[in-house]
UniProtKB/Swiss-Prot annotation:
It comes from Xenopus laevis (African clawed frog). Transmembrane segments: none annotated. One of its GO terms (biological process) is regulation of transcription by RNA polymerase II. It is found in: Nucleus. GO terms for molecular function: DNA-binding transcription factor activity, RNA polymerase II-specific; RNA polymerase II cis-regulatory region sequence-specific DNA binding; zinc ion binding. It holds the Pfam family zf-C2H2. This is Oocyte zinc finger protein XlCOF8.4.
């Protein structure tokens, strides 16, 4: 509507016909032209027409122009509002502008004036009280009547733009030097002062405040524009002219790479100096530019302002959103030249090519382990440093990866994204949902070969097998009691935890409460001991103490026994080393047992704490793998030392664990206790039998969190996972080549030894692996 009004007003000034816009009437008329023609005042009309044209251009482009000499500078409306609101910033920039000497050979015949066009109103800067150039006054004696601008004699130099105009006092010259514009500070939203243009901007603001919007300045608008260019946001005129000329005058002294602007060069230099001046106030992490710091802050605040238009998923940075959107379009423009596999990003195909070349350019300085991705190396380094940079804002618990933190956060938020369509019950993880789904399907694919009992999980079947074999692999560190599964052990450990809580309250030195009454013995105790009162002999009997039952229990008081253990703090740790009478043996033994138990309990509490926090402070000196307890570390180190203390009496083959020896003995006896009810095939191990059953059921319970692919065994999933991480832990001792699976390393070893154990029964040809033999069989 405003555009129409301005256009009609301009038509009126040009033609004298006064058109009036009207609403559409019943007879269909849209415009009424009364035909009245006014007497035009040429001078005033020209001024008004120019003002109307400027307003129309401003509405069309959304920009405000400042013109000076040969150059026009365009600001957006938001930028111009900001400049008017922060004129103090530009006034300060004027004071800091250096004085430029006047070249002696510059002569101009005509005078010049400088104008600024602000939103349709043109401003002239030729009064000495309003504008001053670096070399002298502009037009000290008044306005010129017919100014002309001399064209530039040479291209602008690389270090700035210099425009020379004639003074108005007849022969005295002054120059107007436009200094290099100060560089935009990367990542900031505060414009820096515009060197050389500040006086124009400030004067335009003052004129805009003091001048009526209807006052015309057409008489003062006679500037000829030889160079016009729009400079958006924070202006850098010098860089723009360099880009326009195709110049890159800022070379890097390290690598020789050139840049069009010095700000780009400064950012590039940080790749050589590794300077990271922008640090996070939350975690102290440093970054090379402020944009990266801004994105990093969102990991603390959880802000994700960029949402996907397809699925509504939100992201913290626009480039991550762009990468996500390719999952909807299915675009994968980067193919692998070796196998033809396509990827959405060029970086992914670069990493993928390393699976063909075997290249692992990222090595750990601590243990020498190599990786194909830098991100995998960064995660691996945390096993050495113990760094856990992802902390929960609710409880403060820390994690090594962001995915672990995301799963943990659901315990606070209660988020359960996996819901059952049958009953509506929700679960925080996909694995829990899969287990629940089997309860609706009544699927119990795991059956016991001994008794036929069926289970929904292979772990439940594994625990059930132990009721037949009597195996109890989980032992208590305190008392040595063994259990079939870890859950029963945890319940049992609560007994010792109560003991630790009791000891931590200082009751060992309290004469009124004895810690022994919280340790139920396994049989009846009857002892004679000397009373602490007047040396009389007394009998003390402890009855009704039953054998310790697994799980929580209620401590049974030991009647009148407290004073035998402690009286007035006479028994302490040092008392255990004092000479004892025969009648004091019981008191000493019970008290020493209490001291030993407290020490063992403290150790167990330390291990329990590591289990809860995930802390693994004990690392293997050979490979760097970490463990939470010493005995697990010791068991692992046997794989490096080759220690195998359990030997077979038949063939003298040795094993590191007794369970492995028991399975090996079946190779001599021929025992295969686990048989398949579908095909009748038998197995020596229950684990092998469980894997075999999945070939009938088609079950693949182990899914990859990266690509969703499922596998029948955890070992196959582990091998598959290495295709994502690029890990190849099995290296050849001969040539150093690394492999992701041990079987691949085994086949590779045969290329060095020349072993070919698989022979063809038809022609006798031998092969290093069975798959090659199968391919050969097809020829026959």
């Amino acid at each position: 509507e405003r555009m129409v009004n301005l256009t009609l007003e301009m038509i009126y000034l040009l033609t004298g016909e006064h058109y009036i816009p009207r609403k559409k009437s019943d007879d269909g008329g849209a415009l009424h032209a009364p035909g009245s023609v006014i007497q035009k005042e040429n001078n005033k009309n020209d001024k008004k027409i120019l003002e109307l044209m400027s307003n129309i251009i401003q509405l069309l482009t959304g920009e405000v122009a400042i013109r000076t000499g040969h150059v026009s500078i365009y600001f957006s409306l938001d930028e111009w509002d900001y400049i008017k609101g922060n004129k103090d910033l530009y006034e300060e920039g004027i004071k800091e502008e250096p004085q430029q000497p006047l070249p002696p050979d510059c002569e101009y015949e005509d005078k010049s004036d400088i104008t600024a066009d602000l939103g349709g109103t043109l401003y002239n800067y030729n009064e000495p009280s309003k504008i001053r150039a670096e070399g002298g006054d502009f037009c000290a004696n008044g306005n010129p009547t017919n100014p002309e601008i001399s064209p530039m004699k040479q291209p602008p130099p690389a270090n700035g733009i210099k425009e020379e105009v004639a003074s108005c006092d007849g022969g005295r010259q002054s120059d107007c030097s436009i200094n290099p514009l100060t560089e935009q500070i990367q990542g900031t939203d505060i414009p820096t002062p515009i060197m050389g243009y500040n006086h124009l901007i400030i004067q335009a603001i003052k004129d805009n405040e003091n001048t009526s919007p209807h006052e015309s300045r057409f008489d003062r608008h006679h500037t000829t524009h030889t160079t016009e260019k729009q400079f958006s946001h924070h202006i850098n005129l010098h860089n723009d002219l360099s880009i326009h000329a195709g110049k890159k005058p800022f070379p890097c002294s390290e690598c020789g790479k050139c840049f069009a602007g010095s700000s780009e060069l400064n950012v590039h230099r940080r790749t050589h100096t590794r300077v990271k001046p922008f640090s996070c106030s939350q975690c102290g992490k440093c970054f090379s530019n402020q944009t990266k710091l801004k994105y990093h802050h969102r990991t603390h605040t959880g802000e994700k302002p960029f949402s996907c238009s397809e699925c509504g998923k939100c992201f913290s940075t626009p480039h991550v959103r762009a990468r996500h959107q390719k999952t909807h379009t299915g675009e994968k423009p980067f193919p692998c030249s070796e196998c033809g596999k396509c990827f959405a990003r060029s970086s992914d195909v670069t990493v993928h090519r390393r699976t063909h070349t075997g290249e692992k350019p990222y090595s750990c300085s601590q243990c020498g382990k190599c990786f194909t991705r830098s991100s995998d190396l960064n995660v691996h380094r945390r096993t050495h440093t113990g760094e856990k940079p992802y902390s929960c804002s609710h409880c403060g618990k820390c994690f090594t990866t962001s995915s672990e933190l995301n799963v943990h956060r659901r315990t606070h938020t209660g988020e359960k994204p996996y819901s059952c369509s049958e009953c509506g019950k929700s679960f925080p993880t996909s694995s829990e949902f899969t287990s629940h789904w089997k309860t609706h399907m009544e699927e119990k694919p795991f059956s016991c070969v001994q008794c036929g009992k069926c289970f929904s999980k292979d772990t439940h079947l594994k625990y059930h097998y132990r009721t037949h074999t009597g195996e109890k692999p989980f032992s208590c560190f305190e008392c040595g009691k063994c259990f079939t599964h870890n859950g029963s052990l945890k319940v049992h450990l609560k007994i010792h935890k109560r003991e630790a809580d009791f000891c931590s309250k200082g009751n060992l030195t309290n004469p009124e409460i004895s810690p022994v009454e919280h340790y139920p013995p396994t049989n009846e105790i009857k002892e004679e001991a000397t009373s602490w009162e007047e040396g009389n002999q007394s009998d003390y009997s402890i009855n009704s103490l039953t054998e310790q039952i697994q799980g929580p229990y209620t401590p049974t008081p030991i009647m009148e026994y407290n004073h035998l253990i402690m009286q007035d703090n006479k028994y302490d740790v040092n008392a255990c080393h004092s000479p004892l009478q025969e009648t004091d043996v019981t008191k000493h033994a019970l008290h020493k047992r209490d001291i030993d138990r407290r020490q063992r309990t403290q150790t167990q509490l330390k291990y329990d704490h590591r289990t809860n926090t995930g802390d693994k402070p004990l690392s293997c000196s050979e490979c760097g793998k970490c463990f939470s307890t010493y005995h697990v570390l010791a068991r692992h180190q046997k794989t490096h030392t080759g220690e195998k203390p359990f030997s077979c009496s038949e063939c003298e083959k040795c094993y590191a664990r007794s369970s492995d020896l028991n399975v090996h003995r079946r190779t001599h006896t021929g025992e295969k206790p686990y048989s398949c009810s579908e095909c009748g095939k038998c197995f020596t191990r229950s684990s092998d039998f469980n894997v075999h059953r999945r070939t009938h059921t088609g079950e693949k319970p182990y899914s990859c969190s990266e690509c969703g692919r499922c596998f029948p065994t955890s070992s196959v999933l582990t091998s598959h996972w290495r295709t994502h991480t690029g890990e190849k832990p099995f290296s050849c001792t001969e040539c150093g080549k690394c492999f992701s699976r041990e079987t691949y390393l085994k086949y590779h070893h045969r290329t060095h030894t020349g072993e070919k154990p698989f022979s063809c029964s038809e022609c006798g040809k031998c092969f290093t692996c069975n798959s090659s033999l199968k391919v050969h069989f097809q020829l026959h």
